[in-house]
Amino acid sequence: LSMVANWNAIRLNAQQRYQTETSFGFWTFGASAAKLQSRVAALESVTFHHELGSLRDKTDRLIELAGHLARLLDEDADNCQRAAQLCKADLVTDMVGEFPDLQGIMGRYYATHGREKKAIGRAIEEHYHPRHAGDALPQSKAGRILAVADRIDSLIGLFAVGEFPS
């Protein structure tokens, strides 16, 4: 329970820092709120794993896997694939670079302010959950599908290149 309380305190602190910084003009809407789609190409320059490629490569795998899982589970595959396409794009924004604890939260914000469907923004945020023991699970079906797809990709990929949990 104390771990959850600590995480909530950290998240609250990060959100308060974000609000303080934005009020002083650290982050301007025009520069940082570019549509997430425009940031997807930049994922090519971020290494996910030296044998598994870039975050763009991971994103491409997530699109495929999320679509497959969505069809198996009778969920909107287009929404799941769109969320998969955008879910890592906030990692290359200045805001998440400065405040890494806001990954996913900012992804949802950028998605909804970039006129993506609310369900897509929610799935983007939720796919990081649970972040730690005791954290909330994704509440939307698309969020659960994307969260599972992300973990499947990481686990299978890392096992495939001979990396195992210690």
Tell me what each language-model feature is.
Residues 1-166:
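Amphipathic alpha-helical "coupling" segments that flank catalytic cores
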